[in-house]
Amino acid sequence: MRIASCELAGRTGHEAGRQLLARLYREETGEDLPGILTTDRGKPYFPDSPWHFSISHTPRHAFCVLSRNNVAIDGEELDRNIRLKLADKILSASEKAQFDVAKNRERALLTFWVLKEAAAKLSGEGLRGYPNHTHFSLEDPRVTEMDGCLVAVMEE
């Protein structure tokens, strides 16, 4: 599994993400980026390649992960203004219990958010069912800081 990130530097998140993907794919395979299709639920994939990928972007950064396994990535800026009221809507009971005692509730909510987004991307189902039907931990090792962002990467 390979992960790359960059600042947008005047590009759209889509443009920067595709450039990261093209670079990772070339580094891994020595080939140009193949065509990309999307599933009926919008998950992008390579139809004729054993490689899987995921792209995420924020207002300032893009992230890409490339793997031989189904993979997903989500990133959020650490300084993102997130409404704490969302916790009641998107957290499961076990997650809400962790959130309620967290020293930094904004960071806790962002942690759960990137985990939920990555899980939704990994499943290919989107956020339906994910906001409050998960049981993630604030100590989940799949979340890391990268370029001033919280980033979650999941792989099957």
Give a label for each model feature.
Residues 1-156:
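Core catalytic alpha/beta fold that binds nucleotide/phospho-ligands
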